């Protein structure tokens, strides 16, 4: 049996336990990459796919937050998932769990891009017509 007092042994246990935990925290802090570092380390193909699907993930997150707000405002039990079908219930099996349709999102973004391009083309056309009308004016005419 040890001749050291009990408090000394417990102090040693606390010190070594704290040292192990602190080492783990420091290693985690300095070896875990940030989101930007992680994305930068992706291959160009994976990074392009990540950037392409970012808008879809954001829309899904927004839809999920709306569902969570509706569900939390209701008086239903917590296990009722609102409009999200649970895979553990019979009517929720074999249902696609996606909250946002990727094809519809792609169509919306393409339509938005087309609208922006059309507005830009119309603006350029109006500018060109204005310049042509100014050029056609003679300095002596009242047009």
UniProtKB/Swiss-Prot annotation:
Similarity comment: Belongs to the CBP4 family.
Coiled coil regions, renumbered to chain: 103-139
GO biological process: mitochondrial respiratory chain complex III assembly
Upper classification of the organism: Eukaryota, Fungi, Dikarya, Ascomycota, Saccharomycotina
Keyword hit for Lyase: no
PANTHER family on file: ASSEMBLY FACTOR CBP4
The species this protein was found in: Meyerozyma guilliermondii (strain ATCC 6260 / CBS 566 / DSM 6381 / JCM 1539 / NBRC 10279 / NRRL Y-324)
Compartment(s): Mitochondrion inner membrane
Any single Pfam family the record assigns to this protein: CBP4
Membrane topology summary: Single-pass membrane protein
Primary role: Essential for the assembly of ubiquinol-cytochrome c reductase. It has a direct effect on the correct occurrence of the Rieske protein, core 4, core 5 and apocytochrome b.
Predominant subcellular localization, coarse grouping: mitochondrion
Segments passing through the bilayer: 13-32
Keywords carried by this UniProt record: Chaperone, Coiled coil, Membrane, Mitochondrion, Mitochondrion inner membrane, Transmembrane, Transmembrane helix
Recorded superkingdom: Eukaryota
Name of the coding gene: CBP4
Record GO cellular component, one term: mitochondrial inner membrane
InterPro entries assigned to the protein according to its UniProt record, in alphabetical order: Cbp4
Biased composition (Basic and acidic residues): 114-131
Annotated region described as Disordered, given as residue ranges: 110-131
Designated name of the protein: Assembly factor CBP4
């Amino acid at each position: 049996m040890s001749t050291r007092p009990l408090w000394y042994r417990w102090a040693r246990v606390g010190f070594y336990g704290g040292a192990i935990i602190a080492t783990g925290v420091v290693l985690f802090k300095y070896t875990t990459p940030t989101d930007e570092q992680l994305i930068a380390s992706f291959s160009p193909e994976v990074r392009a796919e990540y950037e392409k699907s970012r808008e879809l993930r954001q829309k899904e997150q927004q839809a999920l937050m709306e569902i969570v707000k509706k569900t939390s405002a209701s008086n239903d039990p917590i296990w009722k998932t609102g409009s999200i079908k649970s895979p553990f219930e019979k009517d929720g099996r074999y249902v696609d769990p996606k909250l946002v349709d990727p094809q519809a999102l792609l169509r919306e973004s393409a339509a938005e891009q087309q609208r922006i391009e059309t507005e830009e083309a119309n603006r350029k056309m109006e500018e060109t017509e204005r310049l042509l009308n100014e050029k056609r004016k003679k300095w002596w005419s009242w047009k």
